[in-house]
Amino acid sequence: MLEKKALAERFYVNFGKMSRIGKQPIQIPDGVEVKINNNLIFVKGSKGELTQELHPEIKAEIKDKEILITLKHNKSFNFAIWGTFRALIANMIIGVSKGFEKRLVFEGVGFRVSVSGNKLVLNLGFSHPVEIEAPKGIGFKVEKNTITVSGPDKNLVGQIAANIRASKKPEPYKGKGIRYEDEVVRRKAGKKAATGTTTTV
């Protein structure tokens, strides 16, 4: 009984939080153009342009350099959608005006990474190099052993960075591979070392 009560309380706290997020207007900064056409929202800025289809329960309108997100039907199960779409549109504004970046670090003897046109070319000790093509709006930059993925779409930047990491995941013994810049890799001791010893990088 107590467990059900706790779950119910958590349910209403989370929905209350999401509804508070949804109510907050989104500022439109200078240099950003926003258009709403039926259930589509278009956002354009110096870093690119994005389009998002709105959920059927979500209404968006522009008023005094702000985007207002409201629910068409004020039902509790719509509150999560409300907060989610408000956060999504806010990220679109940030993306086209400032952009998003994700950095990765590669470690390994003989590893080489370069940019060729719109492709990231990774020589990671395999028989052939790994090539990752940049989707529209995504840019690659390589400096020393750091790879930077940039673009206006936060989710796409994160997905491409994840694909790069997956091409050679960091192994736990010598740390060789590709990791996120802020990632902590749990290091394991080799067979000759003491069992259970771990370090971090």
Give the positions of each predicted feature:
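N-terminal intrinsically disordered, cationic/polar leader segments
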Residues: K17-A162, A166-V201
